[in-house]
């Protein structure tokens, strides 16, 4: 066991912030320092090269003497767990030939002023560590216990008389009927159950997995109901089955898309190719991960995103996740530095994360998984809501909603799973088993706070998106084989772990199975059979493949370094047998064989560890499949509606318009969402056509997201969210209708062809066990399932429910309860024919125009449940939340609105579009003004007593910008669709930096543009100051609030349409370029495409191909090192990848020879840039290059920034000098750190960030990583090798850019970079 001391773990501003928080409790406490602490276990019988280990880890042996009065505390991963960092770093060190059994990293904190009071103070402990994921240890000796391995825990047999006790002890959440059912079945089997069988049954039959409430029969108010909830949802598909290819039958729904062509590497040769145009299809799925996010926000949200991504990948026989969405509903934030009068104090559940902690950590977790996996997150929502119903009852989201969804691409030949046959091999693909996420399915199905804290922790999972990336590469390879795809059927591993996934896989094909527990990959030899079978370790899939394909499948996994194990076989008898020592066919032992393909890769792809079987009892599981799936008791619910709500009605006549406007814009639900958006990559994959950010000033105000179906098409897919949950406290049916309506009004920003092509995912949340809430849920489902959606010809082919949305705890001598409203989140998806015809809230500056409001309420202007009411709630016993509830009164009105928008778009009458929602028309208008840096004169032509309902009602509707010259044509079109009574001119843009409300030429209220913007920006600013570098937060606010700021101002020194490569392409010669990737790289497809378009022949090269000698760099004229997260960036971005080259002599020599050849070129982008910068010692002319370290903001930055191309020797940038170009930025470590000032002066800088005035950007976020003089791209002395942190390969077409001048054509300027390389080769 070795302990090493690493570099400082916290930057100066984070240390100061940390110390300040400690001193609020113990003023005399000082932090001397905080360092990374590495704990290393060496493989038995091996000797470690300590100098190499010190070099790789940038660490040293601990030898200093303790300082007087200084106390050290160690914050380590929770005892008994393996951190994601450990998994990635262990693999990295194996790749560098280091004989490491395991490595963990923690933080050593040295404290001055530590006392007995501090040692026992809970507030200090809370600041030092998170008990859900970490342990606080007092000495190095305690740290070394982290690797202690306890004895394997035994299998248990449970007497039938003890089932109730086991139900509580194991957290099974079984009902009395289910316990009786189990007693009956085991009596018939003449034996007692094992603990494994009980846990498996509990997970498979949990509300989370079996959806018992949605499948229940109902009696409401003493009346039998004709439908179950699920039947009402399915009714929408029965009414409108068109355009749906798969519904309710798989991990995701599949719907029709436009014809497209796939671009991917040939699975045999690795050469990238455009495949034939085929009918399009895409899968859609939206999940929630509420309970884990309430307990541990970062890993809860991260694994929520990861689980949904796996659902898309495991659809049919293999899909490819393409773009994501996310969302959060929480209670009041109560930001200490941003108090609001409506956020009144109350008791909070001590066992759950606060709303602020959830929003500080949860979005980072969700974004981190998407970023590292390589999926753009293009859409989201955020709601903060809380309403006091009594002293002990609150309607809020203490148990949050964490939404994770998206869409993916799937080949039509792979939509349907094949049936497994007896003898087919059962595969576990992905990471090893660990004691994490145990019982999550059952835990998420009960009221939060009613289980034990230990069970809460056990249900929390941990994330490793880089492992999931490897799994996806295996799936992609199998799918590319077309009809030879070896995958017959598969499922992702989620709730219940293997205990749910493998039985589901078998049950789908009506077969049984024999599973050997000893074959299941595990990182923890102490796991009991229950823990091994039921844990929810993430990034795993279970697959069924035929035995003859096993060898080829093993070779695919080996190349991708993706662990897998053949754990069992399918059997004709529908019996599940699981245990140690079961007999399996010899052919399944492929993972133990040294085939020619594996032999060359053994050093880099070790066979996963499996448990050594001690003497165990007989089979842990031996059950007929129908015990799990056949005849469990069906639920019947007998309920009644609660009394009508008694919320008082807001008296808007007593409000001040000036202050009301500021309050509404400052409410977190309305306020700017930049803090949620810029942390997430939105350009990865190269198929983004509309992300959240719009316009030259880049504000996140888009109403929907759009992706492209292919790299050469304008057809694609659009998706949007609708959510109006607080209204359910007034009328749950109306709230559901409003959610569907809002999804449609958001989606109308895209060129939707037909309402019948729109498909919805419905995510339902409720506290179903609280009296009356289930009846309100029934009303809501009926309102859209039986009534609204069929009337609109819209179907709901997919969805999810989470029906334990309440939290209960003891405090102040009382029982406190927090219950969410009945909540519906609608995600709407549709194919679109031409993404260029999208609209955004960005107002046109050059045109005299007016803004028109199309209000679908018919003038009712109902204020019930509005943000206006919420921000005027005070300490009253019952806040004024009531009044008439907004509603979609007639579906025909929405149909007419949809038709109007389509016809107006087709006629070219619309310049801008924004839906009306939270905050009403006032908020929507302000957002359009903010996006466009324009002022507004808002007109109020009706009586002044109707002023507040007019401006702040949140009925369905939209605001459009219409040029004055098109006023008559638009009015005629409105009349044609019967909407004249619903439409009015509401504002016109001005160039003045102010927003006014006018009535009969009288100014009723006026604000400066900056005043309103400050209110709107306040939540983003406050959270960024708490979460990120506060200096950066202040700098961004100052730039964003400046009305005269120029924004993005591109200029071109060349014609992007001029193809300098064409003379060489016309020769028919296509030189080969190695599209180089390491495990965790995710930007290779779009890189290959750009080189292909420029006249090269792109070839997929994994580092394993070079290591094994399958290919050699001599075969290529160039190499492109792609972006992503090699080895998860665990030791610094790109360092693991570089280390795998530097620590292998043959590989190091091969790269050095390639770099030296003057007829070869190399391009490094993002992670590839970071990797090549670490190899500068072997790159001629690169000796002055910097290394790239953590961004100044200490946050992942996803931005569209403005770059200037500087005159340099770079062959890639020839003829582009002087151009100022928008470019996608997405990285966490882009700060260029030079060894000396002389190096900075001597380096050949090729690209730099600039501001809109053309000056080097020195302020955040115009310089998103803080590099000196905005430096972000460099080249060598001869220009053959260029590195840059931004992503030109993601925007070869103008449709890919978040914003660009209207006059730019099809080709974006960045395509010239790749064409220059082809011209240089000649």
Curated annotation (Swiss-Prot):
Any Pfam family matching the protein: FGAR-AT_linker
UniProt keyword terms in alphabetical order: ATP-binding, Cytoplasm, Glutamine amidotransferase, Ligase, Magnesium, Metal-binding, Nucleotide-binding, Purine biosynthesis
Gene3D superfamilies the record matches: 3.40.50.880, Phosphoribosylformylglycinamidine synthase, linker domain, PurM-like C-terminal domain, PurM-like, N-terminal domain
GO biological process: 'de novo' IMP biosynthetic process
EC annotation from Swiss-Prot or TrEMBL: 6.3.5.3
Signal peptide: none
Full protein name: Phosphoribosylformylglycinamidine synthase
Species annotation: Xylella fastidiosa (strain Temecula1 / ATCC 700964)
């Amino acid at each position: 066991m070795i302990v090493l001391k690493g570099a400082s773990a916290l930057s100066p501003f984070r240390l100061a912030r940390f110390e300040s928080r400690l001193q609020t409790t113990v003023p005399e406490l000082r932090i001397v320092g905080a360092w990374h602490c590495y704990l290393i276990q060496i493989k038995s019988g091996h000797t470690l090269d300590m100098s190499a280990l010190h070099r790789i880890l940038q660490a040293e042996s601990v030898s200093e003497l303790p300082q007087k009065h200084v106390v050290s505390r160690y914050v380590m991963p929770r005892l008994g767990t393996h951190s994601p960092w450990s998994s990635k770093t262990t693999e990295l060190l194996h790749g560098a030939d280091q004989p490491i059994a395991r490595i963990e990293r923690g933080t050593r904190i040295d404290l001055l002023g530590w006392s007995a009071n501090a040692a026992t103070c809970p507030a200090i402990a809370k600041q030092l560590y998170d008990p859900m994921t970490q342990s606080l240890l007092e000495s190095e000796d305690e740290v070394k216990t982290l690797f202690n391995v306890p004895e394997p825990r035994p299998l248990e047999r449970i007497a039938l008389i003890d089932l109730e006790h086991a139900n509580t002890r194991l957290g099974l959440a079984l009902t009395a009927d289910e316990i009786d059912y189990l007693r009956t079945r085991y009596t018939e089997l003449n034996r007692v159950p094992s603990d494994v069988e009980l846990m498996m049954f509990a997970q498979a039959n949990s509300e989370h997995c079996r959806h018992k409430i949605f499948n229940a029969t109902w009696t409401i108010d003493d009346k039998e109901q004709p439908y179950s909830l699920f039947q009402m949802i399915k009714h929408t598909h029965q009414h409108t089955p068109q355009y749906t290819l798969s519904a309710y039958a798989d991990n995701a729904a599949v719907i029709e898309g436009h014809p497209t062509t796939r671009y991917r590497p040939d699975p045999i040769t690795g050469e990238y190719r455009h495949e034939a145009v085929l009918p399009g299809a895409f899968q859609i799925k939206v999940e929630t991960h509420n309970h884990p996010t309430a307990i541990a926000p970062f890993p809860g949200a991260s694994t929520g995103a990861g689980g949904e991504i796996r659902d898309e990948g495991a659809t049919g026989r293999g899909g490819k996740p393409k773009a994501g969405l996310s969302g959060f509903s929480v209670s009041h934030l109560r930001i200490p530095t941003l108090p609001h009068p409506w956020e009144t104090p109350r008791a909070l559940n001590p066992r759950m994360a606060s709303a602020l902690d959830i929003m500080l950590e949860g979005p980072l977790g969700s974004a981190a998984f998407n970023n590292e996996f390589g999926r753009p997150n293009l859409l989201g929502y955020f709601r903060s809501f809380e309403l006091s119903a009594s002293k002990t009852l609150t309607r809020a989201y203490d148990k949050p909603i964490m939404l994770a969804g998206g869409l993916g691409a799937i080949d039509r030949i792979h939509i349907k799973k094949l049936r497994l046959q007896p003898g087919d091999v059962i595969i576990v693909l992905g990471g090893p088993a660990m004691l994490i996420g145990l019982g999550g399915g059952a835990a998420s199905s009960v009221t939060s706070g009613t289980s034990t804290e230990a069970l809460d922790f056990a249900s929390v999972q941990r994330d490793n998106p880089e492992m999931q990336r490897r799994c996806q590469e295996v799936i992609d390879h199998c799918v590319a084989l077309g009809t030879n795809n070896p995958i017959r059927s598969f499922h992702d591993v989620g709730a219940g772990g293997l205990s749910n996934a493998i039985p589901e896989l078998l049950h789908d094909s009506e077969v049984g199975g024999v599973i050997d527990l000893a074959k299941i990959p595990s990182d923890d030899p102490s796991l009991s059979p229950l823990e091994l079978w039921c844990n929810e370790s993430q990034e795993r899939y279970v697959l069924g493949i035929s035995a003859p394909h096993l060898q080829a499948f093993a070779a695919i996994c080996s190349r991708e370094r993706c662990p897998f194990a053949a754990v069992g076989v399918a059997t004709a008898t529908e019996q599940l047998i699981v245990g140690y020592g079961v007999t399996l066919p010899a052919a399944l032992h492929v993972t133990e064989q040294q085939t020619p393909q594996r032999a060359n890769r053994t050093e880099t792809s070790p066979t996963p560890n499996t448990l050594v079987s001690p003497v165990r009892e007989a089979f842990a599981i031996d059950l007929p499949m129908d015990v799990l799936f056949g005849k469990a008791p069906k639920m019947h619910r007998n309920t009644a509606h609660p009394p009508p709500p008694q919320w008082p009605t807001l008296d808007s006549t007593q409000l001040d318009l000036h202050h009301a406007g500021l309050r509404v814009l400052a409410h977190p639900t309305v306020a700017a969402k930049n803090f949620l958006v810029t942390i997430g990559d939105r350009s990865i994959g190269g198929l983004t056509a509309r992300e959240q950010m719009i316009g030259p000033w880049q504000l996140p105000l888009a109403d929907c997201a759009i992706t492209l179906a292919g790299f050469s098409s304008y057809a694609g897919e659009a998706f949007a969210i609708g959510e109006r949950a607080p209204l359910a406290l007034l009328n749950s049916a109306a709230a559901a209708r409003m959610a569907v309506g809002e999804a449609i009004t958001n989606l109308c920003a895209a060129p939707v062809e037909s309402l019948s092509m729109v498909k919805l995912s419905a995510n339902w949340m409720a506290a179903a066990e609280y009296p009356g809430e289930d009846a309100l849920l029934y009303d809501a489902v009926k309102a859209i399932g039986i009534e609204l959606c069929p009337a609109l010809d819209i179907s709901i082919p997919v969805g999810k429910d989470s029906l334990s949305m309440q939290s209960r705890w003891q405090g102040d001598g009382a029982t406190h309860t927090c219950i969410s409203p009945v909540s519906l989140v609608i995600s709407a998806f549709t194919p679109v024919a031409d993404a260029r015809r999208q609209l955004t809230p960005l107002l046109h500056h050059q045109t005299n125009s007016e803004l028109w409001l199309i209000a679908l309420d018919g003038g009712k202007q109902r204020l019930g449940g509005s943000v206006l009411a919420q921000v005027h709630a005070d300490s009253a016993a019952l806040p004024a939340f009531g009044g008439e509830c907004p509603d979609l009164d007639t579906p025909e009105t929405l149909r007419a609105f949809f038709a109007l928008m389509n016809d107006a778009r087709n006629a070219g009458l619309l310049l801008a579009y924004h839906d009306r929602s939270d905050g009403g028309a006032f908020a929507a208008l302000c957002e359009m003004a903010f996006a466009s840096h324009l002022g507004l004169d808002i007109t109020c032509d009706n009586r002044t007593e109707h002023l507040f309902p007019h401006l702040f009602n949140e009925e369905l509707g939209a605001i459009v910008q219409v040029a004055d010259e098109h006023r008559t044509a638009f009015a005629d079109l409105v009349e044609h669709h019967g909407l004249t009574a619903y439409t009015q001119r509401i504002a016109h843009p001005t160039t003045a930096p102010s927003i006014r409300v006018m009535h009969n030429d009288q100014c009723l209220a006026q604000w400066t543009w900056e005043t309103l913007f400050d209110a709107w920006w306040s939540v983003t600013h406050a959270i960024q100051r708490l979460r990120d570098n506060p200096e950066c937060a202040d700098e961004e606010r100052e730039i964003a609030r400046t009305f005269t700021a120029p924004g993005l101002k591109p200029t071109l020194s060349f014609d992007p349409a001029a193809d300098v490569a064409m003379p060489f392409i016309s020769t028919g010669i296509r030189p080969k370029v190695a599209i180089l990737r390491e495990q965790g790289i995710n930007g290779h497809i779009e890189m290959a495409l750009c080189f292909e378009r420029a006249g090269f022949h792109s070839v997929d090269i994994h580092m394993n191909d070079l290591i094994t000698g399958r290919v050699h760099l001599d075969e290529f004229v160039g190499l492109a090192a792609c972006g992503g997260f090699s080895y998860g960036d665990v030791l610094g971005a790109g360092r693991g990848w570089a280390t795998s080259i530097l620590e292998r002599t043959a590989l190091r020599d091969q790269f050095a020879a390639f770099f030296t050849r003057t007829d070869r070129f190399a391009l490094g982008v993002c992670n590839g840039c970071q990797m090549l910068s670490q190899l500068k010692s072997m790159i001629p002319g690169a000796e002055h290059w910097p290394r790239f370290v953590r961004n100044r903001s200490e946050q992942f930055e996803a931005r569209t920034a403005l770059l200037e191309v500087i005159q340099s020797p770079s062959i890639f940038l020839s003829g582009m000098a002087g151009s100022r170009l928008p470019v996608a930025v997405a990285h966490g470590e882009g700060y260029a750190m030079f060894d000396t000032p002389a190096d900075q002066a001597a380096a050949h800088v090729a690209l730099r960030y600039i501001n809109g005035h053309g000056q080097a950007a020195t302020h955040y976020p115009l310089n998103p990583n803080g590099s000196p003089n905005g430096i972000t791209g460099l080249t060598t002395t001869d220009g053959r090798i260029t590195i840059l942190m931004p992503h030109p390969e993601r925007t070869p077409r103008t449709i890919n850019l978040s914003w660009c001048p209207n006059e730019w054509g099809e080709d974006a300027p960045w395509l010239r970079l790749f064409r220059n390389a082809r011209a240089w080769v000649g």
